[in-house]
Amino acid sequence: MNKTTEYIDALLLSEREKAALPKTDIRAVHQALDAEHRTYSREDDSPQGSVKARLEHAWPDSLAKGQLIKDDEGRDQLQAMPKATRSSMFPDPWRTNPVGRFWDRLRGRDVTPRYVSRLTKEEQASEQKWRTVGTIRRYILLILTLAQTVVATWYMKTILPYQGWALINPMDMVGQDIWVSFMQLLPYMLQTGILILFAVLFCWVSAGFWTALMGFLQLLIGRDKYSISASTVGDEPLNPEHRTALIMPICNEDVSRVFAGLRATWESVKATGNAAHFDVYILSDSYNPDICVAEQKAWMELIAEVQGEGQIFYRRRRRRMKRKSGNIDDFCRRWGNQYSYMVVLDADSVMSGECLSGLVRLMEANPNAGIIQSSPKASGMDTLYARCQQFATRVYGPLFTAGLHFWQLGESHYWGHNAIIRVKPFIEHCALAPLPGEGSFAGSILSHDFVEAALMRRAGWGVWIAYDLPGSYEELPPNLLDELKRDRRWCHGNLMNFRLFLVKGMHPVHRAVFLTGVMSYLSAPLWFMFLALSTALQVVHALTEPQYFLQPRQLFPVWPQWRPELAIALFASTMVLLFLPKLLSIMLIWCKGTKEYGGFWRVTLSLLLEVLFSVLLAPVRMLFHTVFVVSAFLGWEVVWNSPQRDDDSTPWGEAFMRHGSQLLLGLVWAVGMAWLDLRFLFWLAPIVFSLILSPFVSVISSRSTVGLRTKRWKLFLIPEEYSPPQVLVDTDKYLEMNRRRILDDGFMHAVFNPSLNALATAMATARHRASKVLEIARDRHVEQALNETPEKLNRDRRLVLLSDPVTMARLHYRVWNAPERYSSWVNHYQSLVLNPQALQGRTSSAR
C-alpha cells in the first residue's frame, strides 16, 4: 500500500467514492476532490482546494446552507459565527480618589457620569416601595449586627485576665525603666489587639448569622412579597422580538464536559418549544493547541447531533485581552446588539430550558431589571470532598441566598454565571477600565462580576437574585487543593475590587458587597492574628511575673484573673452564631421532608459529619488564605503548579508539599502549648490538630472511591442524586459518550488526519491578503516546524500554525507527500495512542 492509497483510506468516503479517486499522487487526490477545479502555483497548496469536500464528507449534517464561504483570497472558510454588527462599548475611567474629585469640582472640571439621568420620575416612583423596604431592612441588619458585636466585645473584655486598664497612665511611666514599662504595658497591648480583632471577626460572624436567620424565615413561610419570581406566573409566551444569547466563555476546559453540559442544556431548551428565541455562543480563549482542535471537532459534532445549524456558534480569540470579562466584552461589541438578553454560562454550568425561559420571562416582566442571578445548585461530583461540599451548599446555601435577597432585594449580587443580563445597559455601562497605577492591585480587573453588578446598579438598573427559581446547576472543585487554586484568584480579585469602594456613584449596598468580598479572605489573617495574640498572651501569663502595681502609690494589687465559666459562656454563644444556621437548615429539611436527602437519620448523620469536616478544614483554609492575602499585598506571585494526574485524587507527595508547613506549625504549636499550659491546649485543640491532620484529610477527601462509598450508604445525599433532573441525566449520558470519542493530541491530528485538517484549515482565522513577505514568513514557519521533532515545537508556534489556513494545508500536504523526509513527524504520529471513535467523524459517531 503506497502513501496515496493510505491517504485515500483515511478519507471519510464510501468505498465507491474512494475507488473513483486517482492513485497516482496526493496532489491528484486533492484536485479530484475540488469541485471547482482550482489550480495552485504551489503543489503544497493543493489541499486548500479539497477543504470543502473533506468537510462535507466528514460532517454532512453540521454545515448550514451558506456556512462555507470564500475569504478574500478565494479560500474556503467555515463561518462559525454570524455576521458581526458592531456596537461601541467603552469604559469610564475609574476615579477612586475622593480628594481628587473634590479638587476637580472646585476647579470646575467635574465630569458628569453617563449614568445620572437613566431613570424617569415614573420609573423611580414604581420602584420606590421596594427600595424603601430594602433600606429599612438593611438599617435593621446594621443595628442587630452592631448591637450584638458591642455586647459580645464588652463581655470579652470582662473575661480577659488583666483588668487594670483604668490604672495605666503613660505619664507615670516616663521616669521609670523602659523594660519595666514595657512589661507593664505588654499584656494590655496584647489584650487590646485581641479585643479589636474579636470585634471585627464577631461582627463578620454576626452578619452571616442574621442573613441565615432571615433566609430561614423566608423559606419556612414560603411566601416572599418582594421575590422577583412572583412577578410572573411562569407560562407566558416569550416575546419573539426579544432574543437571548447563551454565551459560554471557556479557556482550556475539559472539552467532553463542556459540550456534554451544553448539549443537555440546548436539548432542554428545545423541549420547551422556545429554541427559536435562543442562540448559543461558545467563546473560547483556549491556548492549548490540542484543546483548540478538540473544541472545533466537538462543536461540529454538537451541531450535527442537535440540528443546531445557524443557532450554535463557536469562536476562538487569537488575542486574549482581559480574560473572561474581555471575552464577554468582545461578544457584546460584535454581536450584542442582535440580542435583548444574554445568559452567561460557566464551563461546568447546566441549566434547564424551564429555568432559561423563566429568566427571560422575569426580564420581560421587570423592564428595569438589569441582571437576574439564578441560584445554581452544586451536583455531579463523586469525590468525598466534593460530595461533602455539595451537601453543604444544598442544605445551607438556600438559607444564605434567601437571606441575601431579603436584605438586598434589587441591589444584589451577580456571581458571573447562570445569570441573565440585559445586553443594552450592559454595553452602555458595564465595560471595565483597568485600575490605575502600578503594582499587584492595578491593571485589568480580575473579579469582574461584582464590579459589573455595581455598575449596572449605579446606572439605575436592578440586580436581583431569583433564589427560588429551579433548574440551575454547577459543579464544585473535586478536592481541597483545586478549590484553593480558585480561591487564590478570587482573593486577589476581591482585594483589587476594594479599590472601587469610594468610586463616585456606587450604591451603598455594592460598597458593602466590595467590603464583604474583602472580608471573605481578610478574615483569615485576622483570625490567625487573633489566635497568635491569644497564644502570645498565654505565653506572657505563663512565663513572666505579673505586674501587680501599675501606679507609684497604688494601694491594692491588680491580680490576673481566670474565669473559665465566663469564657465557656462566650465560647458557647459564638458557637451558636456559627452553627445555628446549620441547625436551622436541617430543621427546614425535617419540616419539609427528608426523603430526598436519604431519610431523617442519614441526613442528620450527614450534617454531623459535614460539621466535623468543616471544623477540620477551617484552620487549613485560614492559613492558605492568609498566605494569599499577604502575597497579594506584597506583590508576590504564588506559583502553584500541580503534577498532572489521571483522576481528581491528590497524591501523597503533593499533599505533604502543600500542607507540610501546616503540619509542622500544628506540631510546634501543640507541643509548645502543652508545655506552657495544658488547659490552653484544650482550647486550641480544634485548630492545631486540624493542621496536623491536614495532609491526611486532603488526600482521603480527594478520593472518588471514598465518595462513592458514602453515596452507596446514602450519606451526603442531595435531591439531584435522589431524583436527578432530566438535564443532569442527559449531561452524564453525553459526558460518557464524549469521553469515549475524546480527541487527544489534537494538533497532530489536525496535521495528519484529512478531516480534522480540513476543519482546522476552514476555521483558521489569520486570513491575510497575499504578499511576498507573508509567503516568506509562512515558508519559514513550516520549514522550521518540519525540520524539528514535534516534541520540540512549543505551544506558541503550534498556535501560529493552527491559526493560518495556508500553513495548515502545507503541513498536511508535506507530511503525506514526503513521509521519508519528515519521518520524525510520521513516527511521532504513529506512536500516538489513537482513539478510533475520535476519528470516525459524524458519519459514524451519530449512528
UniProtKB/Swiss-Prot annotation:
Cystine residue pairs: none
Cytoplasmic topological intervals: 1-138, 217-511, 591-602, 703-847
Membrane-side (Periplasmic) residue stretches: 157-193, 535-567, 626-679
Membrane topology: Multi-pass membrane protein
Functional pathway: Glycan metabolism; osmoregulated periplasmic glucan (OPG) biosynthesis
Main subcellular localisation: membrane
Residue intervals passing through the bilayer: 139-156, 194-216, 512-534, 568-590, 603-625, 680-702
InterPro entries: Glucans_biosynth_gluTrFase_H (IPR023725), Glyco_trans_2-like (IPR001173), Glycosyltr_2/OpgH_subfam (IPR050321), Nucleotide-diphossugar_trans (IPR029044)
Record's protein name: Glucans biosynthesis glucosyltransferase H
